[in-house]
């Protein structure tokens, strides 16, 4: 429990960190705003935010509005926590069963549970296919708690920046782009790495469910200089973090790489 409380405390501290307005690139921010607004209009999003940060923590662009909400982008954070113990490795095999598993009393479903799940896969493959079960079993094997907290996109980006110094995780996040669900975010101008997700924000019987579609990543993949998060909320399906938020990430990266 102490580790969870410390995590919540660190997230709270992140929220209090002021943004240095002098670090904002106004030209870049205008371009990012246009890219985000175009995609939001295309998918009928009700809100959205895009943030660019350099590796020193300076904000280069921040457009739109973000709020505290669940985020499936926490999976790489939880996996990082497990890897840091040295008790599990990306090459370890876990059984995701038929896409439904009971772990620590909780029923966890992978997105493809109705198609029979992924079965036995490595943890690297588990992250690449966004398997909730694989990450949950990794934390269980390592004896740590999975991180599950409400966060803003800015808080999420700062947490993400803190883990991408881990070379093993960096290789897994690159693999997510080349061989996993993040192919839509791939750029032909520079190698990128990252992770996408979709979270259910609210379910109202009288309305379509609200989803958050998100992508978080960085470039260049080998020596990160900038990290980017894109988060958009929309009503109803389709709702894909990789296809929707990932394409915004790609457009932003291409814009920056062209400078």
Enumerate the predicted regions with their spans.
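Sec-dependent N-terminal signal peptides
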Residues: 4-12
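Bacterial Sec-dependent signal peptides at the C-terminal "C-region" and cleavage site
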Residues: 12-23
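Beta-lactamase-like hydrolase cores
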Residues: 22-53
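A penicillin-recognizing enzyme superfamily signal
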Residues: 26, 133-136, 148-256
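Active-site SXXK
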Residues: 32, 57, 68-97, 126, ...
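Short, glycine-anchored, charge-dense loop/turn motifs used at functional sites
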Residues: 50-62
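Conserved catalytic neighborhood of penicillin-recognizing serine enzymes
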Residues: 88-144
